[in-house]
Amino acid sequence: MTKSLPLLSNIAWASRLVWRSGPCLTILSLVLVVMQSVLPLLGLYLLKLIVDEVSTGLAASAKTASFSGITYLIFLSGCVVLIDRVLGTLSSLVATAQSLAVTDQVYGILHSKSNEMDLEYYENSDYYDTLHRAQQEAPYRPTRILNGLLSLAQSSISLLAIGGLLLTFHWSVPGFLLVGALPVLLVRFRFAKKLYIWSRRRTPKERQALYFNSIITGPVHAKEIRLFNLGDIFAERFRTLQNQIRQERLSLITKRSAAEVITQTGGIIPAFVLYGFLAYRTLHGQMTIGDLVMFYQAVQRAQSFLNQFLGSIADLYENNLFLANVLEFLALKPKITDTARPKAVARPLQSGIVVHNVSFHYPGSDRPVLDGISLRIRSGEHIALVGENGSGKTTFVKLLSRLYDPTAGAITFDGTDIRELSLRDLRQRISVVFQDYAKYHLTARENIWLGNVEFPPREDLIVAAARQAGADKAIAKLRAGYDTVLGKWFENGEELSIGEWQKVALARAFMRNAEIIVLDEPTSAMDAQAEYELFKKFHKLAQGRTAILISHRLSTVRMADSIYVLNNGKIVESGTHDELVSRGGNYATLFETQAQYYR
C-alpha cells in the first residue's frame, strides 16, 4: 500500500499541472476519449448487420431490397469510420496544444525553483545531477502521464464495451484473454524499474559527456582548443563516454525485448484457442456468419484494447518513476531564507555595518576562507579590501549580500543581524560588480537596465549610468547604439572588448542607485591609469553612499577612508593609506613592489 502512495501522489501532481495548463483543453480531451472509445463497438455491430444482411440476401428472392438495406448499412459504417478519423485528428491537435502548454508551465516551475536555490547548491555535484535529471524529464513526463491517463481511460471504456459483448458469448472469455496478457505487464514493470535505476547511475557520465561536447562546440574554450590542438582529445573522451552509455542501454533494452517476445508469444495462444472455438460453434449451427465475424473481430479488438490498457498502466508506472526526478528537484529547499517576520532595512543606514568575529568555510570543505574577522563600516564610508588571491575578499562580499551565511559570527546593519532582515530588501540596497561579472547577450540598453528592473527602462537613467561608468563612448560606436545586441550569440550582435564589457557591468551597478555599492576587481582588464581615473570618478559619484572597493592595484585604493588587508582569511592590517605605508607592514611592502613598475 505504501508503495502505491507515491505513484498516486505523482500522478495527482501531474494531473493538477495539466489541468492548470488548460482546463478547456483537458475537458475537450476527455470528451474526445469517450467518443473514440464507443465508436469501435458501434463499428463492430454495423459489420455484423452487414454480414447478416448479405447472408439473408443470398437466400432471399428480393435481391434489390436486400442490396438497398446493405447500402444503407455500409453508408452508416462509412460515417462511423469518417467520424473516427476526424476525432483522431482533432485529438492529435488538442494533445499537441496541451503538450506545449504543459511544457511552458513546467519550464516556468523549474526556472522559479532554480531562482530560489542558494549558491551553496552550486558547490555540490549532486545538485547538478539532480538538476540535469529534472531538466531532462520535466518537459515531457507530465504530458506523457496525461496521454497515459487518456489512453487508459479510452482503453478502459473500450474494454468494458467489448468485454460486455464477449460475455454474451461466454463468461470466461475476458478473463481468459487477461491471463495471457498479464506476463507482458510484469515484464514491463520489472524493466521500467531497472531502466530508472540505471538512468540515475548514468547521470554523472552523461553530464561529463555533455561537458566535453560544450568544450568542443562552445566559444569559451575555442581559442585554446585550436591553439593546443585539443579537439581530438575531448572528442575521443566524449565518444568513449557515449559508447559506454549506449552499450549499457542497449544491453538493458535487448534483455527487455527478449523477455517481451517470450511473454507475447504465450499471450497470443488464448486468442487462437478462441478463434477455433468460434469456428466450431459456427460449423455446428450455433452461430450465424455475422456472429462469427463480429466475435472474431471482437476478440481481436479486445486483445488490442487489453494490450493498450496494460501498456498504459506500464507507461504510467515508468513515467511516474521518472517524474520523481522532477519532484526530487522541486523538493529542494533554499537555506538562505527570510525569518517568519523579516525586518525592513533602515533607510538610510544610520550607524552602519558591523562585522562581528565572522568565520566561513564553503560547503564540503573544512578550510576557513574567513577566520574571525571583525570590522565596522560607517554609513557613507568608503573602504577598501586588499590582499592576495584567495585571501577571502570576494567571500566577504558574498556574506554581506547574503549569498551565503557565516559559519560563525554575525553581520549587522544598524545593530540588526542581516539574517533577520528581508532578503529582498537587503539585496535591493546593495549593488555589486563581481570580478566574474555577467555578460548578457541582450541589447546594451537591457544590459544596463538589468541593474534596476524594479522600474521601467528610462532612457535618461540608462544613459546617465553609462556615462558614469565610461561605457557611453563604446556604446556610441555600435551600429544601433543602445539598441545593439551585445555578443555574437544572436543575429546582428556586436562583441565588446573585455574592458568595455567591464564598463557595461559597472553601468549596471550605477543603474541600481543602491545605498551600498561594491566593486570587486571590476577593472582588472583596464590599465592602471584608466582604473585610477574610474575609481577617482567613482569616489566622487558615490559621495553619501557606502562603498567597498576591492582591487589588486593598491594605487587605486589610496582615496579610501579605510583600508583592510586580508591574508589567509584574516585581517592583518587596517588604516588609511598613509598610516599603512608608514607602518612598513604587508601593505607597505606590496605597495612599494607595485610602485616600482610605474616609476
Sequence positions of predicted segments:
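Extended non-transmembrane interhelical loops and adjacent amphipathic helices
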Residues: 1-12, 96-143, 205-248, 320-333, ...
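Transmembrane helix-loop-helix hairpins at lipid-water interfaces of multipass membrane proteins
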Residues: 26-90, 162-195, 269-276, 280-296
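An intracellular "coupling" helix at the cytosolic face of ABC transporter transmembrane type-1 domains
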Residues: 20, 135-145, 197, 201-204, ...
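Cytosolic ends of transmembrane helices, especially the final helix of ABC transmembrane type-1 domains
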Residues: 230, 254, 273-274, 293-331
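Alpha-helical transmembrane segments of polytopic integral membrane proteins
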Residues: 44-51, 107-111, 124, 128, ...
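Membrane-integrated ABC transporters
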Residues: 1-40, 58-73, 91-95, 112, ...
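ABC-type nucleotide-binding domain
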Residues: 346-599
